[in-house]
Amino acid sequence: MSLFEWVFGKNVTPQERLKKNQRALERTQRELEREKRKLELQDKKLVSEIKKSAKNGQVAAAKVQAKDLVRTRNYIQKFDNMKAQLQAISLRIQAVRSSDQMTRSMSEATGLLAGMNRTMNLPQLQRISMEFEKQSDLMGQRQEFMDEAIDNVMGDEVDEDEEADEIVNKVLDEIGVDLNSQLQSTPQNLVSNAPIAETAMGIPEPIGAGSEFHGNPDDDLQARLNTLKKQT
């Protein structure tokens, strides 16, 4: 603490002074509330004594006690009025503090906005916006070009696969027609010897059939055609 503060006291801001006064008012309100509770207890005690004096026939004592009761209730009423006034003053102080805080906040915000406006370069911001829009359009065009190129490549591959499938199916169909026509024109004695020819070509015999197995040549040829189609 400096000598100036020790002699004249610490320099207190208006906000701190208002806060200090508000604390003092709240402390006074609590003291008034305690005194009011004491008077209320005194009120109940006087009422009990007045009833007791009246039962005992002590009229004079009852009148004195009644006057004390009236004064006590008047004090209670005064304490209520004082407390209400102090609460009103405390609310006003709180409103002043809030207004001061809001004023300072608005002042700081105004200064901040003013500084931002001074440092903001509108022409530069406009150039940046135009350049951003230009680059975005360029990127969109390049993306469209890449998408079209990929679609073309994938489309060619799909077309090639479809054409290859058509050729294979056509060849297999032609082979099937030729084989069927040959089977229809083959004599019965050649058909009976078909298992021997198929064995010479490398067709495996069924398990357990031995050399006496005689299969149907039409079924065997059809099975071979189906196998070729599945492999393609």
From Swiss-Prot:
It is a peripheral membrane protein. Changing L228D: Abolishes interaction with VPS4. Residues 183-232 are annotated as: Interaction with VPS4. Changing L221D: Abolishes interaction with VPS4. One of its GO terms (cellular component) is multivesicular body. One of its GO terms (biological process) is protein retention in Golgi apparatus. Belongs to the SNF7 family. Required for the sorting and concentration of proteins resulting in the entry of these proteins into the invaginating vesicles of the multivesicular body (MVB). Acts a component of the ESCRT-III complex, which appears to be critical for late steps in MVB sorting, such as membrane invagination and final cargo sorting and recruitment of late-acting components of the sorting machinery. The MVB pathway requires the sequential function of ESCRT-O, -I,-II and -III complex assemblies. Can directly stimulate VPS4 ATPase activity. Core component of the ESCRT-III complex (endosomal sorting required for transport complex III). ESCRT-III appears to be sequentially assembled as a flat lattice on the endosome membrane and forms a transient 450 kDa complex that contains DID4, oligomerized SNF7, VPS20 and VPS24. SNF7 oligomerization into a membrane-associated filament is nucleated by association of SNF7 with VPS20; the process is terminated through association of VPS24, possibly by capping the SNF7 filament. VPS24 subsequently associates with DID4/VPS2. This is DOA4-independent degradation protein 4. It comes from Saccharomyces cerevisiae (strain ATCC 204508 / S288c).
